C-alpha cells in the first residue's frame, strides 16, 4: 500500500457522558480551538455497533489537515487547559489515525 504522507489525520473520540452541563462548557470552548487548527468535526453522537462490543456509547470524528496539526491541537496549552472540564464531562479516550 502506497500511503500519501500528506494525508488528513483523524482523531476518533469515544466516550460516556458523566455531566451534560460540563460537556456543554467543554464543547463550547473546544470547538473553536478545533477550527483554529484547521480541524472539522465530521460526526458526533451515539455509536451504532456494527460488530463487536462498544465500551463507550458516544463518539466523535475530527479531521485535521495532517497528523502534526492534530497533535499540535491536542498539545496546545489552550486545549490542555480544558482537560479538567473534559474529564469531568466524559469518561473518554482519544485515538489518532492518519
Locations of regions flagged by a protein language model:
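C-terminal structural segments of small proteins and small subunits
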Residues: 67-95
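Short S/T/G/P-rich N-terminal loop/turn motif that feeds into the first structured element of a domain
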Residues: 1-58, 63-75, 98
